[in-house]
């Protein structure tokens, strides 16, 4: 459930409607479905089966007036009735308001020039030297230097982080005596950690034409990467942010990664907290799964920009398409392309031609199909290379070695509770590793943190390892910097965690692993979608094993996750027609 919505607000809203409007039972049920769906995630409006007569009745009852938990008894209506594409849409006020403000702010930023630079952009780009960025990346950097909004999207390995590192280096080098205040953020702790690691690594490969102090400053910026909640100062007890519309975040540049994971209300909070002249660079992959909570903001922005050439939003979005990650693993890249384009026949043919190697080696082009094994999991069904990687995690002698090994392998599944869900897979793997003959100590156990914890400064999605060191069993997490030892957290201080040999695909977003076993859901699962499979297979750096049947692949590629959102309608209303070419 989104932290921006309190479950306690649902009951008063429904009671208000019943009391004020004397709603019949069928419409009470509609409202319950709408409010529950929006609080649990998924949709930012509802396409309810409203007849013209009912639409007129709703129209007289729904008024676009603000509603908050504190004034629920005073507001005439928590709902808004909107007509779009010939269909009545019933929408909760909070999402109507959020989408309106997001559309307005995004379009204003797209049209606003960024604060002036000390040097011409051409001179800054020349500092990078030759062959540092391709044409697409150069265009993305130029856009971010010119505007207060840049939307940079692309699949894995297309150079998003490479581009960001060079953009940041140029911004720092432009004001060497007083570098800009820069914040890096991502929706989850794991995504923020990945962002930090990637930018730090990119800083080591900046061209020699840039001053050494620029590289040092960039590493300092990378080390400060945080979750969006931490950046905004979100207080879970009040549902409010320290940085907001009246108390802005002091920042010259804000870069947000993994934007597909951000829900509507968090987008609204982010935009409200920024000064008009703050450079905002939004980065993500619109083909991935949407946010767990309500909304599909990144996807809506990209689709609108793509379908409205010449508009302000079209001028500030850039897609990077030249992927390097799968150049030596073409099987993964080919499957990802087939999935994105919903080419079920091509995906099935590709998998059928990639049976798991019989010689217990990793597949040469990074892809293997394991079949579905009758829908039942057994350790023996895992490829030998995956078994060896899991054992390396379990038996690593030091926390540093265990964490390094853990980054190399993961099982990903659609469900948490299911025959092949994360909970059952974790139990089965831990049981096998514990019952091996001849082991001398309990196996190390990977864990994932389930919520932000200010006391330990562990964030939702942080991955660690529980293990014995010198007879003392504790949890260890990746260090804050590459040259520091792993962070030790006593078991008594750990927040709520779950085992992490296997993760749900949703929880894996923002992560990468050398080897990934993707366990597909049954073909009749509502989670079997194109976005789910794409997100899972693109978590792999070197090798992906697909566990599942042909029927699931075909069912998933016939289903695209569609969020009911009216953000595009709000953008349409507020966007002026593009000027004709001279």
Task: List where the protein language model places each region.
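Residue-level signature of catalytic and energy-coupling elements of molecular machines
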Residues: 51, 102, 227, 257, ...
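ASCE P-loop NTPase helicase motor core
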Residues: 138-141, 145-354
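Conserved helicase motor core of P-loop NTPases
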Residues: 287-447, 451-456
